[in-house]
Amino acid sequence: MREDRKGIRGRSPTLCVEKKPETMHIRPSILLTNDDGVSSVGLWAAYEALVPIADVTVVAPATQQSAVGRSISIFEPLRANQVVLNGVPAWAVAGKPTDAVIIGLYALKLNPTMVVSGINIGENLSFESIMTSGTVGAALEASNQGVKGIAFSLQVEDQGDKFDDPRTHGQSFDAAKKIVRDVVDRVLAHGFPPDADVINVNIPSKVRGGYEVTRLARKLFHTGVEKRLDPRGRPYFWINGPLFTDAGEGTDVHSVREGNVSITPVTLDCTAHSAHEDIRKIFLS
């Protein structure tokens, strides 16, 4: 059949190019957990900060689990119940922060871009704190399972505030929410540093400076033990002690004391590589 060219005389033929479908933008996904419990105002402050930039699934301990570190429940069964808090479906895990991460990854089959833990009520500064913190412990567990994690903690001015009910804590999270979103946004844009397994972020109660990349101080508290007597005259003990006033420039403790946001890259490799030669002399010579 002859082509009818009427109507195109005097014009160059128009090439018909097949349009390729536009690449779909894949929205990042975040597993959000903590150690203060699924009802904590700090966790929901983090949720509010993150939901505009990612799909967020909350999987957190059902109850307060501060200072449990990376402990894991292996002698009792775990229950995960779906609840609705603040109008949002969430999973409440009757276990530790580490349990919540494992349940999220392996029972709920989540495949998050990253795990975010926090916002913890109270700072998690120094080696001493990150080894006992359930907030940091959850991020460490996530990274050990192949998903990089960021832990967020907000300094309290009175250490006793850490023991208030996290469901009704009066701390302001306005500045912290902006920092949480900005930090996660930056990491999503640039990618997680390959040599860091966890990023530990500590936000001062009153931010006076900017971001500071820091190293871990050794200790946050002067360790002490207080002996008391119960009504029957039998002794019992409280582990307590005042905070270090400082720990030297470059440390996370110093940074937060100065009003800066401390960002500490943490690795799972606890090997003391620089000590290998001395160890060889002791055991292999």
Name what the model sees in each region.
Residues 25-30, 41-107, 111:
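A cross-family phosphate/adenosyl-ligand binding-site feature
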Residues 32-39, 129-130:
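Short, glycine-rich nucleotide/cofactor-binding loops
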Residues 25, 168-171, 190-285:
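C-terminal accessory domains and tails appended to enzymatic cores
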Residues 150-182:
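Short, glycine-/small-residue-rich phosphate/pyrophosphate-handling segment
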Residues 103, 110-161:
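Internal, conserved structured core segments that host functional sites
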